[in-house]
Amino acid sequence: MANGRVNPTFTLEDQGINGLGAVHYNLIEPALIQEALKREEGTLGKGGAFLVETGKYTGRSPKDKHVVKTPSVADTIWWDNNAEMSSEGFDALYADMLAHMKGKEYFVQDLFGGADPAHRLDVRVITELAWHGLFIRHMLRRPERGELDSFTADFTIINCPSFKADPAKHDCRSDTVIALNFDRKLILIGGTEYAGENKKSVFTLLNYMLPEKGIMPMHCSANHAVGNPVDTAVFFGLSGTGKTTLSADPERVLIGDDEHGWSERGTFNFEGGCYAKTINLSAEAEPEIYATTEMFGTVIENMVFDPETLDLDFEDDSLTANMRCAYPLNYISNASETALGGHPKNIIMLTCDAFGVLPPISRLTPAQAMYHFLSGFTSKVAGTERGVTEPEPTFSTCFGAPFMPRRPEVYGKLLQEKIAKHGATCWLVNTGWTGGAYGTGSRMPIKATRALLTAALDGSLADATFRKDANFGFDVPVTVHGVDATLLDPRGTWEDSAAYDAQAQKLVEMFAENFAQYVPYIDEDVKAVAIG
């Protein structure tokens, strides 16, 4: 039995997927919520938000993500970073998953990955959970209803959390699996209910396919000046560095908060929604994002709530610190209707430096920008219990290593070419610690970060006096209107300057050690600006 709206020549049966129970094609939000409630997948929250728990997995499983190694991709995938799967293992996995699906109810969503029609990917997402259908409707871009009648997918994703993989039979690592097959244009996800796997699978596809067209895929947020899409800025950064927070600027138009492409026409969002962290979210600091948590259809993932009043607890991280909400872009009042922008005038690379040695903002040359893009430095903080003062540095190349199927230099060279052609100004912004490392210093004041970004984006920072940083070689402004000058010189914010020097030297050595892996692949101008 099938219901909903679908291209009559592109049903699941036409794809060779037979024998399922009820199949629901392209249901809209109210119908998906009704189905999810009927199946007891979650709770209806305030304002019609949908509250879910994802069980064992409350985050992505990068070690369980595999790419099928076939002759067509064997030489282009970065195998150091992507686990391989044999074609035989994938074929067995697909056959067993289809057998497992027989007689069960499924939800199908036909969607677009990419706001630019010239470069979008048409994706069919088949989900066992109704709320996963709701989630992916928010995260990807929705066709007009009439467009569904002729929709044919470039790629299909099947997500079946109740299916458990067999590592011996399916050539994978555990009973959880995310398997990408570029030849069969198919992604299989099993053994995890965490919804983020759906969105990041599409991101990984675009990250592989777009460079062949000369398009730079970016793990970044983006915004543009009001009434002037040509004045676009992109914000690269790993999770927790401030991509979502800093791009949500009431003075600028939001293009998107996480995944974008840079084509010959400019910037475009891959997505149609946002997937924001909600831990410690407040109406004062982030009113727009906070408001979405009580809007119709917003998916609230892994948040503790009062069973009687349905009030959400933004502080309780007992389920996970990675609690999130997913909502369509149009829930943010200053979001772009087209999700398109110009060529970036400013490129911001966000880092959370828990060593407390990087300045709050630095200007980068194009070669330095390539260096920092390939390095992808930030810090994870070990924990909030007392006595844990040792930050955990991490280098995630391209500010998004888990989603990069190709070698990092492919993306780095694309970025370098685009900066050279369009003349973007590049900045490194530290949203981490100042006045000492994590444990002794304090978090960089967000007001100061916003003031520095405003000066960078409106062009006034270009007129400032800059000094060259002795440790890292980039240019640092000496004074910026509205920002405490002492903040701009990290060494001066430390009580013990010898301790600062030792900590800075430690970070310099880490940069040098990490970057050694890229030296054989890069140009002389980038080698010349390498730290250490």
From Swiss-Prot:
Its EC number is 4.1.1.49. It comes from the Bacteria. HAMAP family: PEPCK_ATP. Its main location: cytoplasm. Keywords: ATP-binding, Cytoplasm, Decarboxylase, Gluconeogenesis, Lyase, Manganese, Metal-binding, Nucleotide-binding. Binds 1 Mn(2+) ion per subunit. It catalyses: oxaloacetate + ATP = phosphoenolpyruvate + ADP + CO2. Pfam families: PEPCK_ATP (PF01293). Belongs to the phosphoenolpyruvate carboxykinase (ATP) family. It is an enzyme of class 4 (lyase). This is Phosphoenolpyruvate carboxykinase (ATP). One of its GO terms (molecular function) is ATP binding. Substrate binds at residues 60, 194, 200, 324. It is found in: Cytoplasm. Pathway: Carbohydrate biosynthesis; gluconeogenesis. Mn(2+) binds at residues 200, 219, 258. SUPFAM superfamilies: PEP carboxykinase N-terminal domain, PEP carboxykinase-like. GO terms for cellular component: cytosol. Involved in the gluconeogenesis. Catalyzes the conversion of oxaloacetate (OAA) to phosphoenolpyruvate (PEP) through direct phosphoryl transfer between the nucleoside triphosphate and OAA. One of its GO terms (biological process) is gluconeogenesis. ATP binds at residues 200, 219, 237-245, 286, 324, 449. Its cofactor is Mn(2+).
